[in-house]
Design a protein with these regions (language model features):
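Short beta-strands and strand-coil junctions in structured, solvent-facing domains, enriched
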Residues: 32-34, 187-188, 207-208, 320-321, ...
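A conserved active-site cap/scaffold subdomain adjacent to cofactor or substrate pockets
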Residues: 226-240, 460-487
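Extended, well-folded interaction surfaces typified by the phenylalanyl-tRNA synthetase beta subunit core
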Residues: 42, 273-277, 281-440, 622-624, ...
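RNA/tRNA-interacting regions in translation and RNA-turnover enzymes
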Residues: 1-340, 344-360
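A carboxyl-terminal module marker
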Residues: 299-302, 306, 312, 454-456, ...
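Polyanion/phosphate-binding surface patch
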Residues: 210, 405, 435, 439-473, ...
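Flexible, glycine/charged-enriched surface loops at secondary-structure junctions
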Residues: 52-64, 113-118, 247-261, 305-308, ...
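Glycine-rich, charged/polar anion/phosphate-binding loops
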Residues: 8-12, 72-75, 154-158, 180-188, ...
């Protein structure tokens, strides 16, 4: 190693190069929302305000000195996503390697040194927080900022060919793209070993656009992370001047061959905030002097005009993009510089009033408690987006689902429109861990779009039961009892079940019923279609239900009428009906509901047994009187009426 200067033997190399460094560990939770703190100079500004020490200004070249030189040709075609574009051309760059001290600093910041021009852009980005880019001047003579109407492929600096869509803002020379605005440059215009002239870009782009582009391409860079925070547009000229200053200091032969051309397309409106001292006293809880308030704000770069106890504060450009916009933000600045540890500890005094849960919230909590505590179901939590691959594995369609435009995972490209496929996927994942289990979830689905184009969000309850022990019919009626109990719990009246055909491909063509309450459709209950069941476990039974909780929350329940239990014993009579396999239980139920009996206290399904091509359905009728002990003869007329009504429909009563 050849050193410039005369150093005595034994001189510690640490005193020659900036190898030793001081590291400040800053526990700053607000860094994400402070674009000015994404550069060392912004942190230095904070230290200056906290310690009261003066802040040194950044050494830059006088950009006005080059005003007579030819400008860089900048065509700002897209004035929506471009805020400001500053550019300058440099030639006669002989030195290719950055100074040792610069390379050491870059290393300490986790950045690999490449060459002088690239290192300068990275150094200034770390120093000021302003991303920059240097193009080889042999491949770019003018600048055009635009979007393309048709998609195309573009190879970035990392050598990857990326698909560019019409929403992506590009930097071009003429009509040839050379960089993805705010994200990464192109391979064809990168700085090479023999590059001796460059065009420097210092720009400000729309932060939301950069974030979407970065997410869409799966390409997150140091530059894109800073642009996402909505940078100060005033930084572009400062960074350009800093680049010229460092380049000419390091390589004295560097020539600036253009003016520092500044295309300021969109300006932020100045932010001015008015407040008075009583406002500060009320929100801080301490009595700060007007002079102390003014000194604090001035140290942070704010401009302050005072009139007695009133303040008119101008927010500096590096805080005005999204950070400081209202009076409460000023209070935060004053209190954090004053020091939160300097506030006296006091008990908070505030009026507390009970919060009454909404009907929807009460329904959700009551439903969860019932399903977990009484029926032993497991609550799951799943994502709103669905895994297309998993849905296809269990034979579920996704053609009608709302699509995600910029999905990060290529398999998760749509949003679910039903809870059932999510539950079935969970059943498939857990089928090997238990021979029998039940799961449920209350969550949102996207049921198409509203007339205005927005997504139609609905909150639904999904339940799924799985068993390799119980038969499908047993599991089916177990779920039916759960839903009936749910209706009585939430609205003091059981839901109504009516046999219907399958509406979805995964529903059983015969074992599917609609669920309603007083004529309002709430959802459906079904066994899993045999074809879909084979994809999960052909030896197991799977049943499921889906209830629209939003629709239920709009319905009022029955009034709870208290009735003292009778002091006289009741009579239980079991009847077994023989019906064809395709006769639903609701048809039997309609027979006794149509008859009036003052003694009938309850009806319960005891069991269903298959016998050849028919079902044997056992039902228990309970009769109770408030005035006396009933005899069999007193309830026989009602039993005979039920038998006669069902006999007309071809449903017989078994006598043995």
């Amino acid at each position: 190693m050849v050193l410039s200067g005369d150093f005595p033997l034994g001189t510690d190399i640490k005193s020659i190069f900036q190898i030793e460094d001081t590291v400040f560990e800053v526990d700053n939770k607000s860094l994400t929302n402070r674009p000015d703190l994404w550069g060392h100079y912004g942190i230095a500004r904070e230290f200056s305000a906290l310690t009261g020490r003066p802040l040194r200004s950044v050494e830059t070249a006088d950009c006005a000195a080059y005003a007579e030189l030819p400008p860089v040709e900048i065509d700002a075609r897209d004035t929506e996503l471009l805020y400001r574009y500053t550019s300058v051309k440099l030639r006669n760059i002989k030195q290719k390697v950055s100074p040792v001290n610069m390379r050491i600093r870059l290393f300490y910041c986790g950045v690999r040194a490449i060459n002088l021009l690239t290192d300068l852009t990275n150094y200034i980005m770390l120093e000021l927080g302003q991303p920059m880019h240097a193009f080889d001047l042999r491949r770019i003579s003018s600048v055009s900022v635009r979007r393309f109407e048709e998609p195309f492929e573009f190879q970035t600096l990392d050598g990857v060919k990326r698909s560019i869509d019409p929403a992506t803002l590009m930097i071009c020379t003429g009509d040839t793209p050379v960089a993805i605005a705010g994200v990464m440059g192109g391979l064809d215009s990168e700085i090479e070993d023999d590059t001796d002239a460059c065009l420097v870009e210092s720009a400000n782009f729309d932060g939301v656009s950069v974030r979407k582009t970065s997410s869409r391409l799966g390409l997150r860079t140091d530059a894109s992370m800073r642009y996402e925070k909505i940078l100060d547009p005033e930084l572009t000229m400062l960074a350009a001047g800093r680049f010229i200053k460092l380049a000419t200091d390091i390589d004295s032969g560097v020539e600036v061959v253009s003016s520092v051309t500044d295309c300021y397309v969109r300006r932020y409106a100045p932010v001015v905030i008015d407040f008075d001292k009583p406002f500060v006293d009320r929100y801080t809880g301490i009595d700060l002097s007007a002079a102390q308030i003014e000194k604090t704000l001035l140290s942070l770069g704010f401009t302050v005009e005072t009139d007695s106890s009133r303040f008119t504060v101008g927010v500096p450009s590096w805080r005005a993009t999204k950070d400081v916009t209202i009076r409460a933000d000023i209070i935060e600045e004053i209190t954090r510089i004053y020091g939160y540890d300097n506030f006296a500890v006091s008990t908070t005094k505030s009026a507390l009033s009970p919060v009454r849960p909404t009907a929807a919230a009460s329904d959700e909590n009551d439903a969860k408690n019932l399903l977990v505590e009484r029926f032993g179901l497991h609550e799951i939590h799943s994502y709103l987006w669905c895994d297309a691959k998993r849905w296809k594995e269990i034979g579920l369609p996704i053609e009608d689902n709302v699509r995600i435009v910029n999905s990060i995972n290529p398999e998760q490209v749509c949003l679910r429109n039903s809870m059932i496929p999510t539950l079935l996927a969970c059943v498939s994942d857990n089928k090997l861990y238990a021979p029998e289990f039940g799961i449920f979830e209350i969550a949102k689905v996207i049921d198409g779009r509203k007339p205005d184009g927005t997504c139609n969000e609905r909150k639904r309850l999904g339940i799924a039961l799985f068993s390799r022990i119980a038969e499908e019919k047993t599991l089916y009626f177990r779920l039916r009892d759960m839903l009936a109990c749910l209706g009585r719990t939430l609205r003091h009246e059981a839901f109504t079940f009516e046999h219907t055909g399958a509406e979805h491909a995964w529903q059983h063509p015969k074992n599917t019923v609609s669920v309603s309450f007083r004529g309002t459709a709430l959802g459906s209950m079904s066994a899993l279609h045999p074809l879909n069941r084979n994809l999960i476990d052909k030896k197991a039974a799977v049943v499921f239900a889906e209830i629209d909780m939003d629709a239920l929350s709009l319905l009022d329940g029955s009034e709870i009428a208290y009735a003292a239990p009778s002091k006289f014993p009741g009579i239980d009579i079991d009847l077994t009906f023989t019906a064809a396999m395709d006769v639903p239980y609701a048809e039997l139920e309609a027979a006794w509901k149509a008859l009036e009996c003052e003694f009938l206290a309850g009806v319960r399904l005891v069991g269903i047994y298959e016998s050849g091509d028919s079902n044997a359905v056992t039902v228990r009728f309970t009769f109770v009187s408030e005035e006396k002990t009933l005899t069999r003869a007193e309830v026989t007329p009602y039993i005979d009426a039920i038998v006669a009504a069902l006999d007309e429909k071809g449903i017989r009563v078994r006598t043995q």
